[in-house]
């Protein structure tokens, strides 16, 4: 019998080989992406940005993004003193915004709820917990407990009223899992080289940062631009690179003495209402020297990446910017180009006969002896905007569709962006979209609103969280943008910009979109989805030492906790606790899910 089974296996293998269906070839029949309709989500109402109104909110969300070939199965829930505790399955390739509504406006120490998930086809499990802590300035918290996957636990505070905490998971049981509780290696592209090397750049998905150098206010011009209405990022270029960004919207100006236009006080990142206006309103951010230093630090530590810097403005302004722009003369241009030549891993003499978006990823990643490419694209007010011998190129070398919604509310911006990327198709021969698409996942509030509530709050409360349910559910293997450009990348809590306070949703989303979503499209990933291949070495394994620690809400990390410690876990279910099937506990009992 054993011999017969062996012969059957060999015959089956021979049939697969004869039909060309090896384990390394993409087969449309392997597709796991789910097309089922997800429950509608809810955007944060505008009035909740008011901290007084937001503080009185009783409704919050926990969003789960599934970029794996496995269904996330809800096994059960229980809640205490909650009017709504609505959790459900998360199918492959989809996201679910799970809703929580507390019974009372003021939290008590007894408010609690737990949702237990199993990853279908595996022995992996995770739990989502909502708990109140009294006394505390941030009493309502969420714990994402992935210790059952070997990925640790993290405690979060909601960024505002009617807002979400998000969890992104990618990978597979065969490949290994990765989640957004913490950042992975800085060189995420190099880590998936075998996955993306043969894909053209227009088939890659990457994070981008809007007004990337505006991570600080340096006041090199005299204007009313402030942190609230002019700063767009909380972390510098180096940390933006570490959080996964590979497309940088960088706006550079020279700053000149009021009494001497010929005296250049240096090149600075700038964010103003109009760089060509008679009166420019805004402020300066990082110096170009600091930006270059941060780029070089990152690339020395993380070789092999493709990094784009799209540089705009490229004019001068007086310290008091009320006399219009100063167009750069040859001396200023030479000085600027000299600065750019200090950037390491520029790619000289690239083939410009082919649009950069059509080159394979490996073309750039293999440059500089495998150290990758820092690609400088100039798009400002210059004549002669390139020097290929220096690795400096006109932005026209790349066909780009850069879509800005110009909407104040996330609820208006989101459908506009989704409709834009769904208007084109990825893969499919002649129908394959040939340009590089930038989705500006941004809102554009007016000056009054930004000054009152800040660009930071607009980013971390209504806008960025919506990407992980509305944005993800607007994508599928044939429809997605190349760049997801955001403000305040990595920032989950207001003004918490230290590395240990950042969260890795955008990083993990980028990894998962390339690893899972694009790989589900056989016209994009000609090789079999790496998450389904036998014997595939995953990113998780390549990271080395496994981690199953705990990150607390204040950023404190415990790398080797007691295995019985699970933040927010309810040991005894009190009478009045409601199970997911509607059963109400009449007498306190041990938690059956432990």
Label each region the model flagged.
Residues 343-478:
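Surface-exposed substrate-engagement region within the catalytic domains
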Residues 277-343:
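Catalytic cores of phosphodiester-bond-cleaving enzymes
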Residues 1-20:
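Fungal secretory targeting signals
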Residues 251, 309, 484:
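Conserved, mostly hydrophobic/aromatic
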Residues 209, 253, 312-316, 379-381, ...:
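Active-site beta-loop-alpha junctions enriched in small/polar residues
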Residues 21-243, 256-301, 306, 443-535:
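Long, acidic (Asp/Glu-rich), low-complexity accessory segments flanking structured domains
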Residues 243-248, 302-308, 370-373, 433-434, ...:
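Loop/turn elements at helix/coil->beta-strand transitions in domains of secreted/extracellular proteins
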């Amino acid at each position: 019998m054993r011999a017969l089974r062996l012969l059957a296996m060999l015959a089956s293998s021979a049939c697969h080989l004869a039909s060309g269906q090896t384990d390394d070839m993409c087969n449309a029949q392997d597709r796991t992406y789910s097309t089922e309709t997800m429950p509608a989500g809810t955007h944060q109402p505008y009035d909740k940005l008011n901290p007084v109104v937001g503080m009185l909110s009783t409704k919050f969300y926990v969003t789960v993004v599934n970029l794996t070939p496995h269904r996330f199965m809800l096994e059960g829930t229980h809640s205490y003193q909650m009017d709504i505790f609505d959790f459900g399955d998360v199918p492959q390739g989809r996201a679910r915004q799970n809703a929580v509504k507390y019974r009372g406006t003021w939290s008590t120490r007894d408010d609690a709820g737990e949702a237990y998930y199993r990853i279908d086809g595996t022995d992996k499990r995770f739990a989502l917990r909502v708990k109140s802590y009294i006394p505390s300035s941030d009493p309502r918290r969420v714990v994402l407990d992935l210790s059952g996957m070997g990925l640790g636990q993290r405690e979060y505070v909601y960024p505002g009223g009617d807002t979400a905490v998000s969890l992104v998971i990618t990978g597979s049981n065969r490949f290994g899992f990765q989640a957004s509780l913490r950042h992975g290696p800085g060189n995420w592209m190099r880590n998936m080289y075998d996955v993306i090397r043969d894909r053209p750049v227009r088939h890659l998905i990457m994070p981008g940062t809007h007004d990337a150098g505006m991570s600080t206010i340096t006041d090199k011009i005299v204007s009313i631009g402030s942190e609230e209405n002019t700063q767009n990022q909380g972390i510098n270029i180096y940390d933006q690179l570490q959080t996964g960004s590979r497309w940088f919207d960088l706006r550079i100006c020279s700053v000149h003495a009021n009494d001497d236009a010929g005296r250049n006080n240096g090149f600075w990142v700038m964010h103003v209402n109009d760089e060509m206006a008679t009166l420019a309103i805004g402020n300066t951010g990082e110096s170009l020297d600091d930006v270059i230093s941060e780029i070089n630090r990152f690339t020395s530590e993380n070789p092999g990446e493709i990094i784009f810097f799209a540089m705009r403005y490229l004019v001068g302004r007086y310290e008091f910017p009320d006399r219009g722009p100063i167009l750069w003369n040859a001396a200023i241009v030479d000085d600027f180009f000299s600065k750019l030549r200090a950037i390491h891993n520029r790619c000289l003499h690239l083939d410009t006969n082919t649009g950069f978006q059509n080159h394979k990823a490996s073309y750039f990643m293999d440059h500089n002896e495998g150290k990758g490419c820092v690609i400088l694209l100039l798009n400002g007010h210059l004549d002669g905007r390139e020097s290929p011998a220096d690795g400096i190129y006109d932005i026209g070398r790349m066909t780009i569709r850069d879509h800005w919604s110009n909407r104040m509310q996330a609820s208006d911006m989101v459908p506009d962006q989704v409709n834009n990327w769904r208007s084109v198709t990825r893969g499919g021969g002649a129908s394959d979209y040939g340009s590089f698409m930038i989705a500006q996942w941004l809102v554009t509030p007016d000056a009054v609103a930004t000054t009152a509530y800040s660009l930071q709050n607009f980013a971390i409360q209504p806008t960025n969280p919506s990407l992980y349910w509305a944005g993800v559910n607007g994508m599928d293997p044939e429809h997605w943008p190349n760049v997801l450009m955001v403000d305040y990348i990595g920032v989950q809590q207001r003004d918490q910009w230290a590395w240990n306070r950042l969260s890795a949703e955008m990083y993990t989303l980028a990894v998962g979109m390339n690893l899972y979503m694009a790989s589900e499209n056989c016209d994009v990933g000609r090789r079999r989805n790496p998450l389904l291949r036998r014997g595939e070495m995953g990113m998780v394994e390549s990271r080395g030492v496994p981690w199953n620690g705990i990150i607390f809400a204040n950023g404190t990390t415990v790398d080797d906790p007691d295995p019985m410690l699970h933040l927010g876990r309810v040991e005894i279910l009190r009478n009045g606790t409601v199970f997911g099937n509607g059963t109400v506990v009449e007498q306190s009992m041990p938690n059956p899910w432990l």
